[in-house]
């Protein structure tokens, strides 16, 4: 086997799907007023984390993004860090 093939095979073996945090918490619909839940999906620079990092489904990621944007508009979450 070539070196690249060995490296690729190792990476495929070590890759695991992330646990879905919303499913684990039993949350079906994301609410913009639930700040503690939304903070899990925001980085330290207050950017919305990607699906790859959070382990959400595409539909849940859209719900989280909309909820974070609504919470920012309602001044429940800051737009940026200081």
Swiss-Prot record:
Pfam families named among the record's database cross-references: Ribosomal_S18
GO biological process: translation
Region: Disordered, residue numbers: 1-23
Positions in coiled-coil regions: none
Transmembrane segments: none
One of the record's GO molecular function terms: structural constituent of ribosome
Source organism, top-level taxon: Bacteria
A cellular-component GO term for this protein: cytosolic small ribosomal subunit
InterPro entries in the record: Ribosomal_bS18, Ribosomal_bS18_CS, Ribosomal_bS18_sf
NCBIfam families: S18
Quaternary context: Part of the 30S ribosomal subunit. Forms a tight heterodimer with protein bS6.
Protein name, as recorded: Small ribosomal subunit protein bS18
Gene (UniProt): rpsR
